[in-house]
């Protein structure tokens, strides 16, 4: 069996060959088309009727082999005749609807089988399938189908995420096309509009998941905004608040001025800017300059001079409340305790000493401080008790705090106006290019503005410690990461965790279950002015009761917070809510905690950590015991997929094909290709040619089954049990290597090594079943008298068992083609056949099938065949399929007996007219023959007559002799080294003596071969 490295090298070689062949075919098609056009122009009236009839006779329509009358949801009606070619569209039609309707994917909460549970990472309701979803689906469905076939009560829960920002943005865009805004509709009508959009468009991705074959339990489909999930979200919020884990505070947030909401860290993309760069920003007619740092002076109070500061966001100077210097900077000792004066509003800016923020070696050593608009300045502002002045409105305009000259200006227009104002006052000191990282909203591409806002937060310190211990504690470890290296990243995230901002200024989402009580006696009437006036409850009625208890005897007005929760909050409890929590449902009792979470490593913190933190706090247990994190997909050149690069791959385009660029590959080939890539560290460089290669491989499987069905015949009845030891050699061998493939596949699946599992299945089908076994058993189906009925029956049984087992082994990887082919196989008499391969048992290793002796002997057979094929390719320029005589030259009786006993297999696989086995000294090589060494005990000769290129053979032998000479000299040098006899162990010295003897023997042999060929050359010349 090929090693993983050898198999990967072979696949890459095959890909290159396919790429080369593809280019040749495109060039040929182009040339043929051009020639046809020329011909048509020369003979416009010439009839093509005969050629059309001839072509039609050879072409098949895939639809002819699927009964179009199969009602949706019924078992597929296969044609009696099997198509000659595999067609993904024909094969993948109808099966899924039947699987779903038959209930093969439905779990039973009352089952006595062991449970295996996963939740599908809920895709956005706005989403369409992308290649990352395809990878997730391929991996998860592989695991689910394997576990289902392995006797587990499998539950795979599908769900959709309401995707607050993405969905609201999508619906607002639709409203804009109708010249409306959400404010024109009002909150209730807008929410109604979103629900209508969701019902109409929201299930696209779920339909596409079916196209990929995802065997989800659709009877348990859920949506993060449905009634049950919404109740769970409210319950989680209330419990966290009552335990002091949720609080309200005024802090800096990532603010999207276009959406007018705070966004999460996960929704911020960072763009590295090397120099002055123009970028388009939503809401601006012309591009905005970034990558510049502007220097300007602040005059010092009392005419003491000035201090020069620099910033990439000069518009924020309107909110500056201090200048910071390093306490040890001797240049500014005289400024300790002094003030600068703001040039536009006269505000006194204290000069504060701060060794934590200020680097005296950077720039002038003076730093402008805007506590309300910069994270570092915010912390410094708290340390020095500075004033926090917000100068932006929610939509990114300058507010009244910025001064009358700039009020109402968009922030980047104000940037230009402020520079002009500084120039007019003689305070502008210039600008230069500056490398910077710019935060952009991934949804809108708006430039993120740090803004100080009152928001709701989760205190993560204690729950993060529990989540960290669950994965790293030696005593209480409950959580395992695969691959293991992500445990270190888990530690890094959770040891440095910050409190989580969970409120969003949107309308679509879970409205925060918090009500503000405005008391009749309150001096400040602004909503939210008093932090202790909030009550958190499950319903408004409950909130009124709590407010009455909190403010006894006082009159109050109650109003619910307009904000909604961060989408990650509802996603964070999805393993709980998907199973019915907070109710003790049958599903929750049977299936929680889940068994495994599979997702991309890019959301380890944003989703996985939050699920573990929230799940442990709310249920007392981890929501899953294992986390498998898959790689991120890149293009063939290793580049991140993006619309700007034009390298985004739509998996549906691969499945259906795209005219002129991608051939129709089908879901099976795409799934298998993605699974075969999973060994590539943390990134997958996807080459479409590999998918194309697996689509071609599906055709090979198809033809293998066609061959088998012909050989089995209509009346064949498979056996209920097998006795391999009574079977012919090739049959014993295929069962033995199949057994090993089964063991390797199961071992790899258990270890989450999906690429190795795919390679094990592929290698058996491709290199052992198709390339060897099918060819080796052809003599048993030859003319009557060439074989015994018993041998023919054994070959049929081994063929059927190999196919049936191999299809079950492959099914979780390629569900559609395996179902189609398995349904065509005959079944044993007097046995109850399962309705579908979906619910069959997954293969397990059979103790009596493994035969090491047979496998070792087959290695000799295949090595001999490989050498004979190499000689054929080397010696024959034409008639390469001509049957030729050959013989084996054996060094000893043991080798001779092995080769003699397998003469039929060698003759068949090497396409020989005869094959003679001789002991050394019993032969004289015939003229026109060439030799190849199989191993130290065996050489094979192929006789091609005078067609042999003697000079080429001589050159090959000279190279072989030169190589042997190098080996001899190297070994002799080792054996003659000082201290060799005294220091080298006896067994190694003995091995070296044997190696040297073999080298000398080979040396003599090829010297004699060279002499023989020289004599032949002379004979031919005569």
Predicted regions and their residues:
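Feature 926 captures the class I aminoacyl-tRNA synthetase adenylation module centered on the KMSKS loop
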Residues: 295, 496-569, 573, 617-667, ...
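Structured ligand/cofactor/substrate-binding pocket environments in proteins
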Residues: 132-144, 160-161, 229-232, 249-250, ...
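Glycine- and acidic
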Residues: 77-82, 121-129, 187-191, 216-223, ...
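Short acidic-hydrophobic surface loop/beta-edge motif
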Residues: 294-301, 338-343, 439-443, 515, ...
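Catalytic cores of large soluble enzymes that bind and process phosphate-bearing ligands
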Residues: 83, 87, 91, 131-135, ...
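N-terminal, positively charged nucleic-acid-binding surface of large information/translation enzymes
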Residues: 2-328, 356, 370-402, 411, ...
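Short helix-capping/linker segments at secondary-structure and domain boundaries
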Residues: 243-246, 579-585, 615-623, 680-682, ...
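Active-site-adjacent bridging/hinge elements
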Residues: 112-120, 142, 175-181, 206-213, ...
């Amino acid at each position: 069996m090929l090693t993983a490295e050898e198999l990967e090298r072979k696949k890459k070689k095959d890909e290159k060959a396919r790429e080369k062949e593809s280019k040749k075919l495109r060039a040929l098609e182009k040339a043929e088309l051009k020639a046809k056009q020329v011909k048509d122009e020369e003979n416009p009236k010439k009839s093509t009727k005969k050629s059309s009839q001839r072509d039609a006779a050879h072409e098949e329509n895939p639809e002819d082999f699927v009964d179009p009358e199969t009602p949706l949801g019924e078992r597929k009606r296969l044609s009696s005749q099997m198509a000659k070619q595999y067609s993904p569209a024909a094969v993948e039609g109808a099966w899924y609807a039947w699987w779903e309707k038959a209930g093969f994917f439905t779990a039973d909460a009352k089952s006595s089988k062991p449970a295996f549970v996963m939740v599908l990472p809920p895709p956005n309701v706005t989403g369409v399938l992308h290649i990352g979803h395809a990878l997730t689906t391929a991996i998860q469905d592989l695991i689910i189908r394997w576990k289902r076939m392995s006797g587990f009560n499998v539950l795979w829960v599908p769900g959709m995420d309401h995707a607050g920002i993405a969905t609201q943005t999508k619906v607002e865009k639709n409203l804009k096309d109708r010249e409306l805004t959400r404010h024109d509709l009002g909150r209730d009508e807008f929410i109604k509009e979103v629900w209508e959009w969701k019902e109409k468009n929201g299930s696209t991705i779920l339909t596409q998941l079916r196209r990929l074959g995802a065997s989800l339990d659709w009877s348990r489909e859920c949506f993060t905004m449905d009634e049950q999930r919404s109740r769970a979200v409210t319950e989680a919020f209330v419990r966290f608040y009552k335990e002091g884990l949720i609080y309200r505070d005024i802090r800096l947030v990532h603010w999207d001025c276009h959406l007018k909401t705070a966004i999460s860290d996960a929704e911020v993309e960072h763009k590295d800017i090397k120099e002055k760069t123009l970028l388009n920003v939503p809401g601006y007619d012309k591009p905005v300059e970034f990558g510049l740092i502007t220097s300007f002076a602040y005059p010092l109070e009392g005419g003491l001079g000035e201090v020069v500061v620099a910033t990439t966001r000069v518009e924020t100077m309107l909110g500056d409340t201090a200048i910071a210097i390093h306490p040890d900077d001797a240049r500014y000792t005289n400024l300790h305790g002094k003030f600068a004066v703001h040039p536009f509003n006269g505000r006194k800016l204290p000069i504060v000493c701060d060794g934590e923020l200020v680097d005296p070696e950077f720039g002038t050593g003076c730093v402008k401080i805007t506590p309300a608009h910069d994270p570092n300045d915010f912390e410094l502002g708290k340390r020095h008790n500075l004033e926090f002045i917000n100068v932006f409105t929610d939509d990114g305009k300058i507010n009244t705090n910025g001064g009358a000259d700039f009020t109402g200006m968009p922030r980047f227009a104000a940037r230009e106006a402020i520079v002009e104002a500084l120039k007019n006052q003689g305070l502008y000191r210039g600008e230069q290019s500056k490398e910077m990282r710019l935060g952009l909203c991934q949804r809108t591409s708006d430039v993120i503005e740090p803004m100080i806002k009152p928001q709701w937060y989760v205190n993560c310190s204690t729950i993060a410690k529990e989540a960290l211990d669950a994965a790293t504690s030696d005593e209480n470890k409950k959580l395992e990461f695969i691959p293991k290296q992500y445990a270190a990243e888990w530690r890094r995230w959770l040891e440095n965790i910050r409190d989580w901002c969970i409120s969003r200024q949107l309308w679509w989402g879970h409205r925060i279950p918090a009500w503000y009580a405005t008391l009749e006696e309150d001096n400040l009437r602004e909503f939210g002015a008093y932090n202790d006036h909030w009550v958190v409850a499950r319903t408004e009625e409950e909130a009124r009761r709590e407010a009455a208890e909190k403010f006894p005897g006082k009159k109050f007005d109650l109003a619910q917070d307009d904000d909604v929760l961060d989408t990650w909050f509802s996603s964070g409890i999805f393993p709980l809510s998907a199973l019915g929590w907070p109710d003790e449902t049958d599903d929750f009792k049977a299936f929680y905690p889940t068994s495994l979470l599979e997702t991309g490593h890019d959301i380890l913190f944003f989703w996985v950590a939050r699920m573990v933190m929230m799940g442990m706090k709310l249920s007392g247990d981890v929501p899953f015991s294992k986390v498998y994190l898959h790689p991120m997909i890149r293009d063939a050149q290793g580049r991140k997929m993006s619309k700007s690069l034009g390298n985004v791959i739509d998996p549906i385009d691969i499945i259906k094909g795209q005219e002129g660029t991608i051939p129709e590959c089908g879901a099976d080939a795409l799934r298998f290709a993605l699974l075969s890539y999973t060994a590539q560290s943390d990134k997958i460089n996807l080459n479409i040619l590999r998918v194309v290669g697996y689509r071609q491989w599906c055709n090979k499987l198809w033809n293998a089954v066609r061959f088998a069905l012909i050989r089995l015949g209509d009346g064949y009845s498979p056996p209920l049990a097998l006795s391999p030891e009574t079977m012919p050699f090739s049959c014993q061998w295929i069962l033995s290597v199949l057994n090993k493939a089964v063991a390797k596949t199961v071992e790899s699946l258990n270890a989450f090594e999906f690429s190795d599992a795919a390679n094990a299945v592929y290698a058996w089908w491709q290199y052992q079943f198709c390339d060897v076994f099918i060819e080796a058993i052809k003599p048993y189906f030859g003319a009557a008298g060439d074989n015994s009925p018993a041998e023919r029956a054994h070959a049929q049984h081994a063929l059927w068992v190999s196919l049936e087992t191999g299809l079950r082994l492959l099914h979780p990887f390629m569900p559609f083609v395996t179902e189609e082919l398995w349904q065509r196989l005959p079944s044993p008499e007097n046995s109850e056949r399962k309705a579908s391969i979906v619910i069959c048992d997954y293969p397990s290793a059979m103790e009596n099938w493994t035969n090491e002796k047979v496998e070792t002997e087959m290695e000799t057979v295949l090595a001999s065949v490989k050498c004979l094929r190499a000689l054929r390719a080397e010696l024959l320029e034409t008639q390469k399929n001509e049957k030729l005589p050959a013989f084996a030259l054996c060094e000893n009786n043991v080798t001779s007996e092995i080769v003699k006993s397998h003469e039929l297999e060698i003759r068949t696989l090497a396409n020989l007219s005869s094959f003679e086995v001789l002991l050394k000294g019993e032969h004289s090589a015939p003229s026109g023959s060439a030799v190849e060494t199989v191993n130290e005990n065996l050489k094979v000769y192929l006789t091609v007559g005078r067609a042999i290129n003697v000079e080429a053979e001589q050159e090959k032998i000279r190279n072989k002799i030169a190589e042997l000479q190098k080996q001899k000299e190297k070994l002799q040098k080792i054996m003659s080294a000082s201290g060799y006899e005294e220091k080298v162990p006896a067994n190694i010295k003995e091995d070296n003596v044997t190696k040297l003897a073999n080298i000398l023997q080979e040396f003599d042999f090829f010297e004699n071969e060279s002499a023989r060929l020289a004599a032949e050359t002379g004979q031919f010349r005569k």
